[in-house]
Every structure is written in structure tokens, then in C-alpha cells.
Amino acid sequence: MNVSILLEHINKLTPLNHAFEDDSVGLLIGDESNQVENLTVGHELEESLLEYCKDNNVDTVVTYHPPPYKRIVDENDIETYLPDPITKSFVDSSINVISIHTAQDVCEEGNAETLAELFGMSNVSIFANSVDNFGAGRKGKINKISPTDLKKDIENKLNTKIIRTNEYFNEIKEIQNIAVLPGSGTQFIDEIIYSVDVFITCLLYTSDAADD
């Protein structure tokens, strides 16, 4: 099949037009007429993935994160974006790259819904909307739990030991209302700050976490 047919299959699972407007999704390196003989998936473009593609004759990669570009602002404040070395390496190697990024976050049975199910949330509602009723965040109720036990629960369910909290986290006596959002939740704090006890997300800028 060619890349255009692969994109049709991807759109059935993860509609790319549901991604955030400013997000880079879809075919970002390559051409829709290119043939797909060997396909792999990855979280993001990196050297180990490139070597795997070369060693296994992989011509097409579906990633979560889009290929990285570097923003350059000249003396006249004109912006240009140059491909990072790893992006250029995939271009030079003629490997098609398709990114699903926030389309995967907001879709049915996507990252946001998976997190809500993982934490056993009930009375779930959507926030951080991209288009229509699709959104990257979920908020709802869980069984009452202490901060210490919630932290352990996050570590176990997400298989991580790298958890950072703000200074108020351990002052909470009991947690029942939570919000979850894959990726960076910084810009969506105002949507949930007064309706949940804890916001679980991948990234918050320090000033936002400290102030809220």
C-alpha cells in the first residue's frame, strides 16, 4: 500500500482533524504516493529508531511526537524553523514520518480515556477541548485516598518513580476529585483548578505549579 492508504487507516483509529489546531500531525516527512513496505511505531524520532529503521529496511514510522524543528528569529524578528539533526537524518534517509500527537490524546480510547480508566475515575467529564466534544483532559471522582497512597498508585500504574508535586500536595488530607491530562497541562490549569483536588499531568512549568 502507499502512504495515503495508511493515513486512511490511521484516521479511522485516530482522527487527525481532532488534534489541536496548532499541532503538527499527519504526514510530516515523505509523500502520500510513497510505498509502505515496512512499518514501525515509536514515541519520537531518535538515533536508536533511525538505526532500527536502517537495519530492518523500515520505510515508514508512526510516532507520537512530531519531528523536532528549531525556531530561529533573525535580527528583523522574522521566524524560520530549521529541522533538528535527527529530523534531517530521517529526511535524508527517505523515511516517511507520520505523527499522531494530540489526535491520540483526544480520540476515543486514546491517552486521556486510558488514564481515566486506569485510575478508576467515575462521573468523568472532558476538558481541554480541541474540536467539538473532543478534549485532552478528563476529570472525575476516585475512591478517597491519601496523598501518599495516590503517589504510590501513580508510580505503580504508570511504572515511574519520577513524580514531582508542589508544596500543597502533602497538605491535602483526602483526595477524591482528580484531573488527568497526557502531555503538558500548563495552559489548562484554569479550567480545573477550583474543581479538583489534584491535577495529574506530564509537565507543568514551575511557576504555574507553585502559584496554583
What are these regions (language model features)?
Residues 211-212:
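Disulfide-stabilized cysteine-rich extracellular repeat microdomains
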Residues 1-208:
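Hydrophobic structural segments
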